[in-house]
Swiss-Prot record:
<feature type="glycosylation site" description="N-linked (GlcNAc...) asparagine">
    <location>
        <position position="66"/>
    </location>
</feature>
<dbReference type="GO" id="GO:0004553">
    <property type="term" value="F:hydrolase activity, hydrolyzing O-glycosyl compounds"/>
</dbReference>
<keyword id="KW-0732">Signal</keyword>
<dbReference type="GO" id="GO:0005975">
    <property type="term" value="P:carbohydrate metabolic process"/>
</dbReference>
<keyword id="KW-0964">Secreted</keyword>
<dbReference type="InterPro" id="IPR050546">
    <property type="entry name" value="Glycosyl_Hydrlase_16"/>
</dbReference>
<keyword id="KW-0325">Glycoprotein</keyword>
<feature type="domain" description="GH16">
    <location>
        <begin position="18"/>
        <end position="364"/>
    </location>
</feature>
<dbReference type="Pfam" id="PF00722">
    <property type="entry name" value="Glyco_hydro_16"/>
</dbReference>
<feature type="signal peptide">
    <location>
        <begin position="1"/>
        <end position="17"/>
    </location>
</feature>
<dbReference type="GO" id="GO:0001872">
    <property type="term" value="F:(1-&gt;3)-beta-D-glucan binding"/>
</dbReference>
<protein>
    <recommendedName>
        <fullName>Beta-1,3-glucan-binding protein</fullName>
    </recommendedName>
</protein>
<comment type="function">
    <text>Binds to beta-1,3-glucan. May play a role in recognition of microorganisms and in activation of the prophenoloxidase cascade.</text>
</comment>
<keyword id="KW-0399">Innate immunity</keyword>
<dbReference type="InterPro" id="IPR013320">
    <property type="entry name" value="ConA-like_dom_sf"/>
</dbReference>
<comment type="similarity">
    <text>Belongs to the glycosyl hydrolase 16 family.</text>
</comment>
<keyword id="KW-0391">Immunity</keyword>
Amino acid sequence: MKGFVASVVLLACGALAADIVEPEDCTSFPCMIFEDNFDYLDNDIWEHEITMSGGGNWEFQAYVNNRSISYTRDSTLFIKPDLTSNWKGEDFLSSGTLDLWGMNGRGDVCTGNSYYGCSRVGSSSNIINPVTSARLRTMSNFAFRYGRLEVRAKMPRGDWLWPAIWMLPRNWPYGLWPASGEIDILESRGNDDFGTLGNQYGGTTLHWGPFWPYNFFEKTHAEYSANTGSFADDFHVWRLDWTKDNMEFYVDDVLQLTVDPGTSFWDFAGMGPFFDNPWAAGAKMAPFDQKFYLILNVAVGGTNGFFPDGIASKPWSNLSPTAFLDFWNARDEWLPSWKAGEDRISEGAAMQVDYVRVWKMESTEQ
C-alpha cells in the first residue's frame, strides 16, 4: 500500500480518496497539498470532459465518461481508448447522430461545444469520431500556483495514440489561448515505429503569446528520450518545479528544460512596442503566475501536425478533408498495435498513472 498524507478520507470500502490541503493550512515545508494514489477514481476531484471537439486539432476521439475507458485497478488509473463502433456499431459512424449534450449535470453534460463538439451527424465521407477515450481534469476542485508537481505514469503503446499530462489556467486572466498560458508536462506518441517521434520520446512545452497566432512555444520546448527502452515499457516520473522566478522540468530526476524569462515573458518574446502587453500587470512569470489545473488524457491522431506527414505508414494526410475516414479505413493496420495479440484492446494501449502529488516547497507564496 502506498503512503498517504494525514487527513485523507477513509471510505467504507477501505479505499483512500484523493487528499487536498489548502496552502494556508501548511505549517511546515515542503507541504503536500494534493495527493491521489488512485485507490479508486475520485469523481469529486477528477471531472470527465465530454466532447468531440478534438482539442482544436481535429483529433479522432470523442471524450466520454465510461468505466471501460477510464478506471482504476491495483491503485493505478487507466485511460484506455476504445472503438466507437464497439459502442454504437460500425454503421453508426456513417449514418448516426452522436449527441453528447446530456442533461444530468457533471459527468453527463457536454463540456466543449467548439468545433462541433457536442453533436455530430455521420455521413459516408465525414464519419463520426471513430474512437472513444477519456480526458480528466481537476478544474473545479484543485488548481495551484507555484510548487512541485510529480506524476508517475506509463505511456500507452499503440499507433497514433497521443497521451498527455498537462495544465491549463483556471480563470484565463490574461485572455484567450495562448495569452493565459499552457503547461505541457508531457506529450508523447504511442507508435513503436515512428522514426524519432515514437514512444521512446517525449516532449515538454510551455505555450504562451499575446494572442493567436503569436505563440512562442519554440522558446520553451524540449524533447528527450527514455533512458532505456520506451516510455511505454515502464513507469517514469515527470516533475515540475515551479517558482515565482522559473520553471524546471525533470524526467526521472534528470533535468530536461529550464524556463527563466529574465525580466518578463514579454521581453523574452521580443515583441517590441507594436503590440499591447497582456501581462504588464502580472508578475515576472506572467502568464505563469496564476493557478493552473491538471489534465490527464489520451488523444488519437489529429491533423495539426503532431503526427507529421511523410513518416512511417501514416494512413491519413493532415490536409485531407476525409482524415477521420482515412484513419478508420486503415484500422487493420493500426488496431493490431492496440490489441497486442489480444482479442480486445490491450491495457498496454492505456496511459497508466500511479500517482499525482503536489507540494508547496518553501512558503505559501513560493
